[in-house]
């Protein structure tokens, strides 16, 4: 199964956070599953680091690609269609990064690994 990781799931995974559910750990460890991180998540992380709201052990432009490689996670580009599809989404979730991830989930037919209950309100499959 191809899965999109929500930003918090990626950050929790790389530090082995106890906040990850056992189901998520099992799904992410399963070699039959392909894990993806949206470029929107990388952008969100970079912005939060720049604003001082998130600390990383290295600059985002070095840290994130290194973690993707180490954890066998593929980047999921944001395409024009993803960005434009956001205009069709109901206004349940206001976070622009999450709205892109939701659009990617719909258009790419990929579940989202997330604890965010607002994302789960959309007509997409989520894993938690």
Model-based region annotation:
Residues 53-65, 69-115:
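Active-site neighborhoods of divalent-metal-dependent phosphate/nucleic-acid chemistry enzymes
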Residues 9, 41-42, 82, 101, ...:
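Alpha-helix capping/helix-boundary segments
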